[in-house]
Amino acid sequence: MSGNTLGRLFRLTTYGESHGAGLGGVIDGCPAGIALDEAVIQRELDLRRPGGNSASTTRQEPDRVRLLSGVFEGVTTGTPIAFHVENVDQRSRDYGEIARLYRPGHADFTYDAKFGVRDYRGGGRASGRETLSRVAGGAIAQALLARHGIAVRAFTVELGGVPADLVDVAGAQQRPFFSPDPDVVEAWEDMVRTVKGEGDTLGGIVQVEATGVPAGLGEPVFDKLDAVLAYALMSVGAVKGVEVGAGFEAARMHGSDNNDPIVPSGFFTNHAGGILGGISNGETIVLRAAVKPIPSIAQEQITIDRDGKPSALFIAGRHDISAIPRIVPVLKAMTALVLADMLLMQRRMATPQP
């Protein structure tokens, strides 16, 4: 199985399955001298940990990270940084009934088509739990970016079709659902309770912003910054679409409206989302990701078994009602990983100053 590594200079390789012994990864290419310890990574992991909100699974995982290499006396050494998290609350018996059935909306059918075998326990490698390793790697990337004055944040702008106003983005991380709007939280919580009672699930939209990004990051033409960011976000299982800046709204605008006037202090507007020609322009990078509803619903569904015979399916187990809010730190991590890689690539290619 290939496709487990992201990046060219700052590289993350991940491993692990939902019901295996554990998950983890290796960061290769991180420069020496970056302040890092387990607490830095743990803070990010705690943001996506299950069981912390009304929309999340009741599976209780402490997600305690262990650094295995690449860090000494609180700083990176320039060697590969390996980390590992144990799985402790698996309940594989919940999945015995679906060993031969394909769950609609999941990767069961496609993994069987590709490999001829699959780990049906919780989705195996295709489980959302796989994103734990991305968040850990992203925490390391954020430590590198912080050294260069770059910060990444993410928050929910829509849940179940109900939008949030960007009233208090700075406080979103301390609010349920990572909401930038205190007034919408109660409506979202009510909707989650209603949908959960119906045995159904919800999708939404997450916005990611990166500030302090210098002009010049991105590698045209096939490794444009927006192309690689979209690639990274789309690699997250629940993401079905990505917008940059004005995104699809730009298709409804005139050029005179969509163009960002350039003034001595920078750009007057930011419809481009901080990227022009695949290269960062120094403005805030703005991304939005469309997150599909969790496919594990508590309703009878029509499917087939591995022999192609029709069957009915009712999914047991413990599942999220929505990937939001736990996907929010995942998308922040993926953005940070790409920016860290692009930053190192730009520094390698930069013309030496006399």
From Swiss-Prot:
GO cellular component: cytosol
Protein's name in the database: Chorismate synthase
Keywords, ordered alphabetically: Amino-acid biosynthesis, Aromatic amino acid biosynthesis, FAD, Flavoprotein, FMN, Lyase, NADP
Residues that bind FMN: R125, A126, S127, G277, K292, P293, I294, P295, S296, R318
Binding locations of NADP(+): R48
The protein's assembly and partners: Homotetramer.
Cofactor note: Reduced FMN (FMNH(2)).
Lineage of producing organism: Bacteria, Pseudomonadati, Thermodesulfobacteriota, Desulfovibrionia, Desulfovibrionales
Organism: Nitratidesulfovibrio vulgaris (strain ATCC 29579 / DSM 644 / CCUG 34227 / NCIMB 8303 / VKM B-1760 / Hildenborough)
